[in-house]
Amino acid sequence: MKFENEAVQIVSDFLDASMAPDPVKAATYMSEDVRITFTGGRVMPTAKDITAFNAGRYRWVKKQLGQFDWTRHEDHTVVYSNGTLYGEWPDGSSFSGNRYLDRFEVRQGKITRMDVWNDSAEWILTPSIAKP
């Protein structure tokens, strides 16, 4: 998908690579000192760590991208991506409709910060709240 806003394009391209999953390509969109924080406050130093974390939590997972929202600041752009996750849990059962919200900071053409929130933890703890 093509976007007029450069920061949104960078985030979109990163998400495409990370969902492939291609952590090597995904890392090319991130600064060397990127700060990645996942649900539960889990800090991850690299895109490879995201792939490893997801491999432990899901058999496989993809994003159904929703809209992108962004706001420019003096030295960076904040980009929000929202939508839903779908895939399979480690036991092979499928899921969809798992809400996510990712927040990115993009500076000088690179993602410098990524914050991730989704419903996975709640769905794992209480599977009955997951809606097909």
PLM regions: where:
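Short, low-complexity N-terminal intrinsically disordered segments enriched in polar/charged residues
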Residues: 1-28, 32, 130-132
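A solvent-exposed, acidic/Ser-Thr-rich amphipathic alpha-helical stretch
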Residues: 4, 23-77
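Hydrophobic alpha-helical core bundles mediating ligand binding, dimerization, or RNAP-core interactions
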Residues: 11, 15-18, 30, 50, ...
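Hydrophobic pocket/interface hotspot
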Residues: 14, 25-27, 34, 46, ...
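Exposed beta-sheet edge and beta->alpha loop/turn motif
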Residues: 84-108
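Low-complexity, intrinsically disordered terminal/linker segments enriched in charged
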Residues: 113-132
